[in-house]
Every structure is written in structure tokens, then in C-alpha cells.
Amino acid sequence: MFRKLLKMWILLRPTHWLILIALCAVTCAGYWLLWSEIRLEHAFKPLSKLGDSLSPDQHASSTTDDFDFEEHLVVLYNRVPKTGSTSFVNIAYDLCKPNKFHVLHINVTANMHVLSLPNQIQFVRNVSRWHEMKPALYHGHMAFLDFSKFQIAHKPIYINLVRKPLDRLVSYYYFLRFGDNYRPNLVRKKAGNKITFDECVVQKQPDCDPKNMWLQIPFFCGHAAECWEPGSSWALDQAKRNLVNEYFLVGVTEQMYEFVDLLERSLPRIFHGFREHYHNSNKSHLRVTSSKLPPSESTIKSIQKTKIWQMENDLYDFALAQFEFNKKKLMQPDNKHVQKFMYEKIRPK
């Protein structure tokens, strides 16, 4: 038997040998491809598990085609004290149920305006991932926090209000002594102190120190240490940059209705009905400081000579100019029709 097989191998022609070698090569290649596919399948299994474990925010960063802007809308109002913020926020509380959005107050320990590093991380995670609360309006007395530092795919929309710095300081001075009509029975920290603001300035007491005006600049500047150094030129420049680049809209207390109007036109998912409610309800001047006396001319001139007032007023004027610009661009040049835009010359047809 062996001799017959050997004889057959010897009698094979060269073409037969080539065919046999080719068949062997194809068979080996097939086995190698099958083995490689099995290895790849095992290698990709952990990756598929990793994909399944990705958070909603991580999925959102990889694909934004299915992102619903309206239903994921988050507005962050880091309200400066004594700028009329209570009046605005209470409209939100009145309309959150019919408009189907949530309002959340950010209450920081001891009324601190800057968050610790662990709390920054936790706050950013809460705002970004708390989908049950969206759409939402968060509000609280805290400095601007840059969400882009935390690799967040969809940052909240910042809004705020500013007020003439001396008016804000005078209002806060009397608020600490006499409170307001919002909670008239609450005893304030300086209750019983009857010294007027004018007298305080003459006596150079700490409660009317111009350094107390240094608040709107750091609120827009943010969480950097330099932001909270009274008189810092860097802080003022940073506050202006953030106001233009990071805030959707900054209004002024003296034009609250126009601020509400622009928000309702721009973000109706949350602010629908705010204009009418502000105009017709008693919420337009909800919190009025009691027993407030206007400062004298001499006091005003004295305060306006200080560097702090000049810098805070610089920011106020800057914000006012930007707000007036946004109001103006709402209308067409004839000032009678709302500005519109359209798409045209779309190719290919």
C-alpha cells in the first residue's frame, strides 16, 4: 500500500504539485483568518461593556444629533445680592408649574459666594446629570463658575442682573438695619443701628467702606483668588470677558421689564409668560428696603472719588452698553418690526 502511494507521488506532474500547494495555502489562510476573528471578538467585548457603562453626558459628547435643546435647557442665574433678583425669581416660582420646568435654589454654607473644589465638581455633576430636573432654572448668590474646565458637553446658560454700585451699597446698608417688606418681621443683623449712610461715611465706619461695593466684579470674574482682591484691574478685565463670552444675557435692575422681555423672546421654553406676569402681578417690586434714605450730594461725590466705585461703575456701564446693544438688535432699523432671519440659496437642490 505504501509503495503504491509513493509511486503515485512520484508520478505527479509539476502542475499537480502546484495545485496541491495552492490548496494547502488556502486551507492554512482560512484557519488563520478564523483564529484572528475569534481573537478580535474577545478583544472587543470589554470595549462594548465600556460603551454600555458610559454616562449620558459621555454619550452626549460623542453624538449630539439627538440632543433636545428645549427639554435639556438649564439656565443658571448667579444672582448678585440687592439687584432685584428676588422679584425676578418669584416670577419663576409662580410659573414653573404651568411652564413645566424646575426652579432650584443654590444654598451655600454661611452665604459663601465661592465653592470649594470638591463642591465645584459635585455642583457641575448635579447640574449636568440631574436629568429629572431639566429643563431647570438654578439660582443663588454665587460667583461665576466656568463649566468648560470640567469637560462638560452642554454648559448651562448664564444670566444675571447688575445695579448701579452706589445704589446697591446703600440698599444693602439699610437692608441690614431695617429689612424689607418681603419679610418685615425678621430681625436683621444690624437692627437697632440708626446711623444713616451719610453719617457712616463721615465717621468712616466699616459698613459704608467702598470696599463693600466690590461684589459685582467678583461675581462675574469667578472663583479665582484675584477676583476677590478689591481694586484688581485683572479682575475687572476678566469680569468683562466673562460677561461677553459666558453670559447669554445680563440686564440692569433699572430696566427689569426689558430684561424679562428679552428672555421670554429668546428662551420661551422657560420664560413664557414672564412679561405679562411681571407687568400685571405684584412681583415687579417684591422686595423694597425699609427706611432707606438717599445719600447726600457730598456723600455721592466722596464715594465717586474712590477707585472701587470707579471700577464697579465701569463694569456697570459696560454691562449697560451690552444690554442696550442687545435691545437695539431685537428690532429692524425702522424700529417697528422685530428682526428676522431666513435661509436661502440652498445647494444642491
From Swiss-Prot:
Active site positions: H139, H141
Enzyme Commission designation: 2.8.2.-
Ranges that cross the membrane: 18-38
Membrane topology summary: Single-pass type II membrane protein
Cytoplasmic membrane side: 1-17
Keyword field: Disulfide bond, Glycoprotein, Golgi apparatus, Membrane, Signal-anchor, Transferase, Transmembrane, Transmembrane helix
Disulphide connectivity of cysteines: C200-C208, C221-C227
Any single biological process term in GO: heparan sulfate proteoglycan biosynthetic process
Residue intervals on the Lumenal side: 39-349
Function noted in UniProt: Catalyzes the transfer of sulfate to the C2-position of selected hexuronic acid residues within the maturing heparan sulfate (HS).
UniProt name for this protein: Heparin sulfate O-sulfotransferase
Protein species of origin: Drosophila melanogaster (Fruit fly)
Gene: Hs2st
